[in-house]
């Protein structure tokens, strides 16, 4: 395909948001520019419930540090303009993610395998997958001792002691950051989880959102 002058592709929409697609994105965008992209938020094929996108592309005339192209979301027929930057691995929301990843590393998660972890068990819980009537979010709840194989729910363990009031403020701030992030990226920033355009967040990204929230709150206090 890399020898083509251009064409049309139909692929999973996670191509634009998944960290694991980094090398594929780099190879593609080092060679091609996208002309226009359609994103489908409903099931399009019988054999898969995953959301897909289609886009037309052409071979680059010159190497560039960023590309901008129109995106239409179906069936809503909403039109957006999307910019992807090379320095952020051509990833949707890459600039924002870089800021999040640069936050101090303060959190891990509580597991049955390590019920007495080094650090402080909090009441901060992350629900990592959108539900039908509830988006992925942070909440305050009793500690959940998860399995090593868990991917959807976790209680955070902090390297610093946090009052319950501070934990509640972190939850509120982190949820606002996630809401703003999804809005700014037209809800294309997190990877899709199976059907109905549901999104998911990995534990490491969740830790980073919580850490950035704490850092912003402490900066405000100072």
What are these regions (language model features)?
Residues 17-20, 34-39, 103-104, 108-109, ...:
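Short amphipathic alpha-helical surface micro-motifs
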Residues 42-50:
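Extended accessory and catalytic-adjacent subdomains in large enzymes
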Residues 49-112:
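Flexible, glycine-/basic-rich loop-and-beta segments that form/coincide
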Residues 116-222:
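C-terminal target-recognition/interaction regions appended to catalytic cores
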């Amino acid at each position: 395909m890399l020898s083509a002058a251009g064409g049309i592709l139909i692929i999973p929409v996670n191509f634009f948001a998944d960290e694991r697609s980094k090398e594929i994105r780099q190879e593609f965008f080092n060679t091609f520019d996208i002309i226009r992209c359609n994103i489908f938020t409903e099931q399009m094929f019988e054999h898969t419930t995953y959301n897909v996108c289609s886009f037309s592309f052409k071979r680059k005339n010159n190497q560039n540090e960023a590309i901008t192209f129109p995106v239409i979301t179906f069936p809503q027929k909403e039109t957006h303009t999307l910019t992807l930057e090379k320095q952020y691995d051509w990833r949707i929301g890459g600039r924002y993610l870089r800021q999040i990843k640069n936050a101090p590393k303060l959190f891990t998660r509580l597991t049955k395998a390590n019920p007495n972890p080094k650090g402080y068990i909090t009441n901060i819980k992350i629900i990592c997958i959108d539900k039908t009537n509830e988006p992925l979010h942070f909440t305050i709840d009793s500690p959940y001792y998860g399995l090593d194989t868990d991917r959807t729910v976790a209680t955070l363990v902090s390297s610093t002691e946090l009052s319950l009031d501070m934990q509640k403020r972190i939850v509120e701030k982190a949820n606002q950051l996630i809401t703003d992030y999804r809005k700014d990226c037209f809800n294309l920033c997190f990877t899709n989880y199976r059907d109905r355009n549901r999104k998911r967040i990995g534990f490491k990204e969740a830790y980073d959102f919580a850490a950035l929230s704490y850092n912003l709150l402490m900066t405000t206090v100072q």
